[in-house]
């Protein structure tokens, strides 16, 4: 993959070509003020940051792509950006997950988890699927289960008010994404809850879902399968990184559109679009990375 930067708009003027992560453009011929860019690779993506060392707001674009004017959305760039790009990233950032699976004090585990080892393996499978979804989108984000604990707590096994829930300090790890897997949220239809940057640190996933059967009208519960939990994890990661439901623009395959997360009420599997068709658009991914370079900057590696 190669990216060619130009000092002037419309691919004119002096140029510099980069093929790897470049934490500072200052030493290149174009310096830190390129005005246009070309991403030559048929696959691959790039993050253009306004500050050195991959800091500041991020502009994300997939290849192949011609950006005739970095400061104009209509020309492939972003309004208000001008020619202020100071660093470029082409390899993924890693987010380390600190996972707490909540059991009752008698040892009962969430959802269909049968043992601590089974919970560990299921979480690993969910994260692997989430990484596939992110990889399909060339999101330049990978997830790693770096900490895993089963924690006994009757009060956190089923979460009554997920948006107001607080968790013990011992469950949190600075520099990690704190993920809590509970049994279920009391609110029907809720498979996960996460607050945006500056409002919360915990990404909550449920292993079991309460819902109203549309045929009988009766309330039911179902254990969630790995694929539905993975879609929920990526959706909640979006919230964690500051993007919200409207960012999906109602797209039938957009991961941030709540209507996309359809499920089979009999086995808890994902019943929405094919996993390979689920998407995050360029602006959503760019906004996620802007949060990871800002309010969530301690979480990325």
Describe the residue ranges of each PLM region.
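Compact beta-sheet-dominated domain cores in extracellular/mature segments
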Residues: 1-94, 127
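A mature extracytoplasmic/lumenal domain signature
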Residues: 10, 52-53, 101-103, 147, ...
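Short, solvent-exposed loop/turn elements at domain surfaces
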Residues: 12-16, 105-114, 187-190, 263-273
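Active-site-proximal segment of zinc-dependent metalloprotease catalytic domains
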Residues: 14, 91-93, 165-248, 262
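Structural alpha-beta junctions
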Residues: 28-32, 72-75, 128, 132-141, ...
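Structural recognition of the beta-strand scaffold that forms the well-ordered cores
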Residues: 47, 97-101, 143-144, 178-181, ...
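Propeptide-to-catalytic entry region of secreted or membrane-anchored zinc metalloproteases
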Residues: 91-177, 181-186, 296
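The catalytic-center signature of Zn2+-dependent metalloproteases
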Residues: 214-301
């Amino acid at each position: 993959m190669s990216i060619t930067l130009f000092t002037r708009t419309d691919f004119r003027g002096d140029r510099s070509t980069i093929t790897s992560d470049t934490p500072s453009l200052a030493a290149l011929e174009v310096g830190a003020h390129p005005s246009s860019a070309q991403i030559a690779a048929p696959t691959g993506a790039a993050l253009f940051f306004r500050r050195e060392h991959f800091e500041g707001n991020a502009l994300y674009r997939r290849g192949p792509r011609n950006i005739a004017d970095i400061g104009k959305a209509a020309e492939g760039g972003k309004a208000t950006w001008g020619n202020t790009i100071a660093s470029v990233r082409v390899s993924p950032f890693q987010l380390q997950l600190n996972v707490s699976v909540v059991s009752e004090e008698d040892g009962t585990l969430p959802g269909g988890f049968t043992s601590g080892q089974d919970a560990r393996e299921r979480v690993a499978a969910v994260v692997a699927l989430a990484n596939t979804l992110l990889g399909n989108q060339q999101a330049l984000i990978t997830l790693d289960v770096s900490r895993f604990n089963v924690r006994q707590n009757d009060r956190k096994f089923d979460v009554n008010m997920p948006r107001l829930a607080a968790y013990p300090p011992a469950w949190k790890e600075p520099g990690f994404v704190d993920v809590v897997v509970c049994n279920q949220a009391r609110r029907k239809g809720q498979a996960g809850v996460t607050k945006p940057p500056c409002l919360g640190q915990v990404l909550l996933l449920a292993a079991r879902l309460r819902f109203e059967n549309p045929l009988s009208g009766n309330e039911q519960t179902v254990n969630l399968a790995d694929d539905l939990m993975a879609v929920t994890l990526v959706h909640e990661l979006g919230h964690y990184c500051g993007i919200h439901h409207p960012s999906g623009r109602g797209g039938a395959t957009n991961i941030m559109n709540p209507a996309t997360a359809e499920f089979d009420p009999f086995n808890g599997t994902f019943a929405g679009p094919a996993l390979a068709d689920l998407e995050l658009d360029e602006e959503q991914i760019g906004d996620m990375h802007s949060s990871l370079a800002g309010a969530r900057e301690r979480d990325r590696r």
